Amino acid sequence: MGDAPKKVGLTVRRYVPEEGFKESAYTVAADRFTTVLDALIHVKEKEDSTLSMRYSCRMGICGSCAMVVNGKPSLACETNLLSLGTDKVTVGPMEAHPLLRDLVTDFDDFFEKHRSVMPWLVRKDEKEKFRPEAEYRQTSREVDYYLPFSYCIKCGLCVDACPVSNVNASYAGPQALAQAYRYNSDSRDQGEKERLEKLDTLDGAWGCEFLGACSVVCPKGVDPALAIQLLKLDLMKHSLTGKTSASKAVR
């Protein structure tokens, strides 16, 4: 038989448009499987239907339920309630993103910054993809260069953890910068020069202070902090030599 459910006090910091924050307190029963998202869904369905939050897959794939749990940017669906080691849990929205209501944030700016780094394969021959004989072949070593940075689920936790993103709304942010490096390091891509020229600014790669918080909170083990430092290295190579594919040339 399993252990009896434990009572946990759940405080939700809710953003109310034109009013600011208010706190709502609830008590939920939690067993060893209960996640923070489970608790919030229970509150929404059984206690307070006015609570607004965003979620979808419930299994750490979509990134929709990103929020701040006991001060740490986290996915609610991957945060076990009892593993927090306290009977008082506080959740709130990610404040580095524009706030909409309660725990829901606006990701328009986030995705605009993501799009700005051209997160797709750029090829000089635009008709190439329409030729059936065309293939983008890669060795396993070439895949290894970018694969660790390709697991991003666009949850926005890294941006919320970033001290620069919290004070400079113009900063590209760790998610976008890491994805820029992911595509620059892909041997199939030919858009490195354009990306480097876009990000050679204080609002781009040089704005990173290398605190590393972005990498600590990433639920998928992506290392945005490392990607940004490698991006800086590529920027220096490009500035000194004018070459844009030095890292690809050695593969």
Language model: regions and residue ranges:
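Ferredoxin-type iron-sulfur electron-transfer modules in oxidoreductases and energy-metabolism complexes
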Residues: 34-49, 92-251
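Short, structured protein-protein interaction patches enriched in aromatics and acidic/basic residues
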Residues: 57-66
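Extracellular/mature segments of secreted proteins
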Residues: 65, 85-86, 216
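Eukaryote-biased recognition of intrinsically disordered, low-complexity regulatory segments
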Residues: 5-26
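Short, contiguous acidic and Ser/Thr-rich linear segments
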Residues: 24-35
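Charged, amphipathic alpha-helical segments
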Residues: 1, 45-55
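Glycine-rich phosphate/adenylate-binding loop and adjacent beta-alpha elements
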Residues: 69-91
